[in-house]
Amino acid sequence: MEKIILLYSDLEGTILRESDSKYDDTDMYNFLKQLSRLQELMDAKVRMHIVSPISQNQMTDILEKLDKSFTNFNRLQKDPSKKLKYIEGAAASSKDEFVAGPQQDFTFNRFVRKMDSRIVDLKRPSNPDDKNPAGFGKLNYVKGWTSMAQERYDVKMIIYCGNGMNDLASMDYVNSKKGGFVVCPDNSRHEAKARTKLVGRKTDLQGLTEGIANINKLLEKRLNPNKEEPEDNDQQSL
């Protein structure tokens, strides 16, 4: 049975900067480098998913850019075991939430033409008065994929990267699972930071990279218990 690591991530303020909804190529390379190291330490493949209430055509554009970043990273890896799989799946707001008015037909056709097949609708709660519909949808996606993966693979670790209120339920779910970790950048709500010790001192993608690096340090410590730890090390245990 294939050994895998499930990695779920939000977008705004995590993968993408809050200021301009972009990421630097160098920052992404460093993030992917830490994921590659995680694969090596766990002897398992990372399967990454993106969850965000953005529109599905926006998600398609982002996945296209991420695919290019993964391709560029993999080209530089001589060892096949260090290469990463492309994003496995994503959830974004359903098309009908963004299709209305006289532009309906044009917009719908644009969705049909552009939408990446990996994207599914972010499920909405049955209660229209739910104050956190994105949080409901994210949790539904995370639970569904995790359950399916546990039937098909040997899931060695589950990681959730997020920073906001609509990430909290998914964070709690991942924390409740064996091998579950939550990673937050510094620009996270205090409610999110309270759910983990893996909080980066930097913002956005750099903060996530630091959090994944800290998981790698924990794994390295387990593999080499005699290795000295930094004096300011404040990490949760594996």
Regions found by a protein language model. Name each.
Residues 57-58, 163:
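Active-site environment of divalent metal-dependent phosphoester hydrolases
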Residues 1-53, 57:
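Active-site neighborhood of HAD-like aspartate-dependent phosphohydrolases
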Residues 29-42, 60-63, 142, 171-172, ...:
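Short amphipathic alpha-helical segments and helix-helix/interface helices
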Residues 2, 6, 64-238:
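C-terminal cap/substrate-recognition subdomain and adjoining C-terminal extension
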